[in-house]
Amino acid sequence: MNRLFYLLFISAILFSCDLNKDDKKIEFIPNLTDLNNNEFKLENYEGNVLIVNLWATWCKPCVAEFESLEKFKNKFIGKKIKIVAISNENKDKIKAFIEKRDFDLEFIKLNGDLSYFNAYSLPTTIILDKQGNESFRIASGIDFTSNNFVDKILVLEEL
């Protein structure tokens, strides 16, 4: 019964996502770097569906969804789907967090405020189509392996 409720809840969240494609391109986000201080640009991923996961080490729902995010990533290796996990926390704190948990995702440091993404709660996941336009966003923790989410991403990947 709990599982059914959970699946219905997740489905309701995903169906309520904004699927309006008004070419909501995310403008240049200043000061994005990888954890080795190399400049990172979202534009480098055009031609791929990009899953941008905004998170923090102190955010329990953020941490909880990483396992399903990694499962999703591993299931679709070779597809035109990329994932980046962006946090604005201290780089050393992010590195220590990753080392303890051994996540294999691309972690990016935002040297600024998450409001650049118009994100005001965590976790927030923003899906960009192959042209870099925002397709939809989810402002809560989700199961990235749910059929509903996977189907939406695969439709974008085929376009």
Regions found by a protein language model. Give the residues of each.
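Sec-dependent N-terminal signal peptides
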Residues: 4-13
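Acidic helix N-cap motif at the loop->helix transition within catalytic regions
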Residues: 93-95
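Active-site acidic short loop of glycosyltransferases
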Residues: 45-48, 78, 104, 119
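Short pre-active-site segment immediately N-terminal to redox-active cysteine/selenocysteine motifs
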Residues: 48-50, 54-58, 90, 121
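Conserved redox-active cysteine motifs that mediate thiol-disulfide chemistry
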Residues: 54-71
